[in-house]
């Protein structure tokens, strides 16, 4: 049985979905219809920052207004054993992660509401509402706090009306305006004006029209497809390329009808890709594609890698707490994450900008924390600027913040080639001591070739070779032996070869020529779905061949199209093949995103109820 807050939420959503339709000519191609998309945690926080006119950096927000404590108690910091850690920043709000679909958030089929999520949305709304009082963009008058009471109320209402339209990403409907005004007057009657403003903002931030992207489209009677309305197109485009709401320019373009043509959509898509907000949004997609959004959870063992970072492999006394290894691994993990982000951003926005470069470029970033992983052959590039970020690490349950500087670098061409040889990707495909060819191979097949390998058979994990430093053979030989039974071969003849391609990299992503005293064998061959065969000598050769594979490029297009629509499209979805053929000929990633924005799949949707066209 649904909890009370969840039942209320569902009722409100049903009211929002039944808005009036409009009319337009039908188009032949549209993606299957889904339930309304909820804002993801990243989209919610970005939208809040843009709505209130604050930067996407909690350290640069103002302090919580004094009135905030009357609406919402401050979030408690996690408690340390010895010294309390600093309190969490006022932004972003930390929501529970979405279940996701195929590794991606923001996909309708992977969004499952919960009572806990609804409660967190309420807490977040109450927390952020008071910031409207100190927002540089909220009030439509310059000096609201010093105005006479009547003028304050007039200005506040005008500001709330404008705020609601921006929050809902469309003009208010007459009934919405009436309800909002009644809510505002009830709050004014109940308490001080600043509190009334904050409570009304909190109500707006809890409305389904804010939290959900409802897309009824412009449907004529009898049409099987409907063009999205101008406001829906603006919203879909902004969350596709920015992970946030439209800016004033895009709102104006929607209002004037500029988005009604593919040329208008293309013009604004190109403008938006040049905006700084596109960079973190595109990086965010690639974190989900590669799984590197989980890199802060990797746990290489001290007994295997302690000496690499200048400490003994074991504690001097078994009763001692290990304080050194967490202090080392905290910056290493964060550096891995930032190196991934900077590589993707620089390659797409400041480099070649192609899928080929994404999988083959041997430039990137490193820090003092990860320098031991890259080794002596990595060359820093002093002509390019360094990047310094603040990170948070936890040692002995004590949180602390420190700076981390990353340096542009060039790596040997026989050791690094694109995202698949980043330490973040390699460490995620490993155990505490040994690399995991099965983990790495499965990731390549599923994320790069769109080949779902399913779950392992019962007891498969128990048959894996032990994750130990002492072994009589190479990691490849042990894995091959463990997966040789007849019950395993059907899957592992596909999974093992792409995993073995990266045997030159240990569990932390360091390149190695030998494994257990024997030369590494990273060669192999693989037949992708559709019959495309790839033969390779090592991970570098494999990455270069994947970069030009039609199957792999088609898969990348499929991931991006699903992400843009928030819909787990089938591989055979109408309209998809044209996008894939174009990307085979021109692998510019920006051009792919523009092509998706221009497509019927992006601009249209079926009429009828969700599921009718699936």
Regions inferred by a protein language model and the residue ranges of each:
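Bacterial N-terminal signal peptides
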Residues: 8-18
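Positively charged n-region of N-terminal signal peptides that target proteins for export
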Residues: 1-7
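Low-complexity, glycine/serine/threonine/alanine-rich intrinsically disordered linker
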Residues: 2, 19-614
